[in-house]
């Protein structure tokens, strides 16, 4: 099973020291740089390229809190998360999603910058609250609950991206 923490010789923990992660990334990338393998055979070059790809994938996973949490869950449960088969069972959150989408559509329709800023702040606060709850769930090894928080965070992340697109469209019209 892919273990991004092992690649960087880090403990499996949601809280990371970004400076240590970045330093180890640079060290690994320097060691795997293609110039180091110019005189090597094709197999060694291919292996170095594969390892470099693994390092990049691991970095991407560890820098993204949702992917990092999902990696921790997978490492502890032995199960990879299949996003296509997952569906949110939290009816209240599904209703909240619909309400937020309608709210964003209304803000965009009205071209209301102040309402958009307030909405963006609300979603940012919700995301922060979900990250805190995710951290607590991981700490207490409640893997199913942590997975649910990942789902919710994935939604708020997408919604934040949509808010940014709406913001760009509103400011283009000004």
From Swiss-Prot:
Top-level taxon: Bacteria
One Gene Ontology molecular-function label: protein-folding chaperone binding
UniProt entry keywords in alphabetical sequence: Chaperone
Annotated J domain residues: 3-75
Pfam families given in the database record: HSCB_C (PF07743)
GO cellular component: iron-sulfur cluster transfer complex
Presence of the UniProt keyword Chaperone in the record: yes
SUPFAM superfamilies xref list: Chaperone J-domain, HSC20 (HSCB), C-terminal oligomerisation domain
Keyword Metal-binding attached: no
UniProt GO BP: [2Fe-2S] cluster assembly; protein complex oligomerization; protein folding
InterPro entries: DnaJ_domain, HscB, HscB_C_sf, HscB_oligo_C, J_dom_sf
Role summary: Co-chaperone involved in the maturation of iron-sulfur cluster-containing proteins. Seems to help targeting proteins to be folded toward HscA.
Subunit structure: Interacts with HscA and stimulates its ATPase activity.
Family: Belongs to the HscB family.
Name this polypeptide is given: Co-chaperone protein HscB homolog
Gene responsible for this protein: hscB
């Amino acid at each position: 099973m892919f273990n991004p923490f092992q690649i960087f010789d880090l403990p499996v923990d949601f809280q990371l020291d970004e400076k240590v992660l970045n330093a180890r990334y640079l060290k690994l990338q320097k060691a795997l740089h293609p110039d180091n393998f110019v005189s090597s055979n094709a197999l060694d070059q291919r292996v170095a390229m594969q390892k470099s790809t693994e390092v990049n994938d691991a970095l991407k996973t560890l820098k993204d809190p949702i992917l990092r949490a999902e990696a921790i869950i997978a490492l502890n449960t032995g199960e990879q998360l299949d996003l296509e088969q997952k569906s949110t069972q939290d009816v209240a959150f599904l209703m909240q999603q619909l309400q937020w989408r309608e709210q964003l559509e209304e803000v965009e329709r009205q071209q209301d910058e102040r309402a958009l800023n307030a909405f963006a702040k609300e979603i940012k606060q919700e995301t922060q609250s979900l990250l805190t709850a995710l951290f607590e769930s991981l700490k207490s090894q409640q893997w199913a609950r942590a997975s649910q928080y990942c789902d919710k965070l994935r939604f708020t992340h997408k919604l934040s991206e949509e808010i940014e697109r709406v913001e760009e469209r509103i400011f283009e019209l000004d």
